[in-house]
Regions:
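Negatively charged, low-complexity tracts enriched in Asp/Glu with abundant Ser/Thr
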Residues: 1-24
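Sequence-level detector for tyrosine residue identity
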Residues: 16, 21, 28, 48-50, ...
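Generic alpha-helix signal with a bias toward terminal, lower-confidence helices
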Residues: 19, 26-30, 59-62
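Acidic, low-complexity, intrinsically disordered interaction modules
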Residues: 25-51
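Mixed-charge, Lys/Arg-enriched low-complexity segments
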Residues: 42-75
Length: 75
């Protein structure tokens, strides 16, 4: 299932789009979890991207924090 939304971390507002499943997907989920795809954008630029594998690492601490929040909710 897909989920979209926005999250504020510090002075940054991230738009996210995440594809997640009810059960973990060991082969291509983040850390073997339920998220198979996740994109974080800030000011129209990609700050993190995972598409069945890591494509773009978190660009800074705010991005890492946003990722941790979404991992807790969806993974």
């Amino acid at each position: 299932m897909w989920a979209e939304g926005s999250i504020k971390v510090g002075d940054s507002i991230f738009h996210y789009c995440v594809k997640h499943y009810e059960e973990p997907i060991e082969d291509y989920g983040i850390d073997g979890g339920r998220i198979s795809k996740l994109m974080l954008k800030r000011n129209g630029e990609i700050a993190y991207n995972y598409d069945r594998g890591l494509d773009i690492k978190p660009v800074d601490k705010d991005t890492e924090t946003a990722l941790a929040i979404l991992m807790k909710e969806y993974n």
